[in-house]
Swiss-Prot record:
EC numbers, comma separated: 2.4.2.17
Pathway in which the depicted protein is active: Amino-acid biosynthesis; L-histidine biosynthesis; L-histidine from 5-phospho-alpha-D-ribose 1-diphosphate: step 1/9
GO cellular component, as recorded: cytoplasm
This protein's UniProt keywords: Amino-acid biosynthesis, ATP-binding, Cytoplasm, Glycosyltransferase, Histidine biosynthesis, Nucleotide-binding, Transferase
Protein name per the record: ATP phosphoribosyltransferase
Ranges that cross the membrane: none
Organism expressing this protein natively: Petrotoga mobilis (strain DSM 10674 / SJ95)
């Protein structure tokens, strides 16, 4: 039996990814302590950081799951057959709660973010030049300490930004978990991939129907 390799994101999407795969007949085995790979019923499961999932899939891992934000930021060569019915959130421009300004007037702003490419492209498309500060986490701190004029980050409930006296000012895009497929796997394991996509679509449509 051919082994199928799958990269699943460690972090907030992992449990939903496992639940989704179980619904379409793929049981994910948790890795042993300190292990990064597990094996179950012809599958090899890898558990990289979400930001690295597209890199693994582009470079030989058969399938993966991560957020659409990660795919857009990394811009790897992967096949994305469909959005998945979880991981729903949005990416937004976030400001101190007492600041009133339109994004059209943010020329020259310092923007802190974990998503420099998406941020740069958004402001470039609006014809605005901004300075981007690439951070790896807790970007709210950059706005609170004043090293950035605004931040671009993921918003789910909005509780974190409210707790830090910030506000969601402008939505840049909606985000969802997505299924990734290696470009070569798409051709060499066509029957498996086609079956997987059909099962995923059927499950997604069933979720929408409820």
């Amino acid at each position: 039996m051919t082994t199928i390799s799958a990269a699943l994101p460690s972090g907030r999407l992992l449990e939903d990814s496992k639940a989704f795969l179980k619904k379409i007949g793929i049981n994910v085995k948790e890795p042993a302590k300190r292990e990064l790979i597990s094996y179950e019923n012809g599958y090899a499961f890898y558990f990289p950081r979400a930001f690295d999932v597209p890199v693994y899939v582009e470079n030989g891992v058969d399938i993966g799951i991560c957020g659409s934000d990660v795919v857009l930021e990394r811009n790897n060569e992967v096949y994305i057959p469909l959005e998945l019915p979880f991981g729903k959130c949005r990416m937004s421009i976030i400001l101190p709660e007492n600041r009133e300004i339109s994004f059209q007037n943010m020329e020259g702003y310092k923007i802190a973010t974990k998503y420099p490419e998406i941020t740069k492209n958004f402001f470039s498309e609006k014809g605005l030049k901004v300075k981007i500060l690439k951070l790896n986490g807790a970007v709210e701190l950059a706005a609170k300490t004043g090293i950035a004029d605004a931040i671009v980050d993921i918003v789910d409930t909005g509780n974190t930004i409210k707790a830090n006296n910030l506000k969601e000012a402008y939505k840049i895009m909606d985000i969802s978990a997505v299924l990734l497929v290696n470009r070569i796997t798409q051709k060499t394991k066509f029957d498996f991939i086609n079956d997987l996509i059909n099962k995923a679509k059927n499950y997604k449509n069933g979720v929408k129907g409820h």
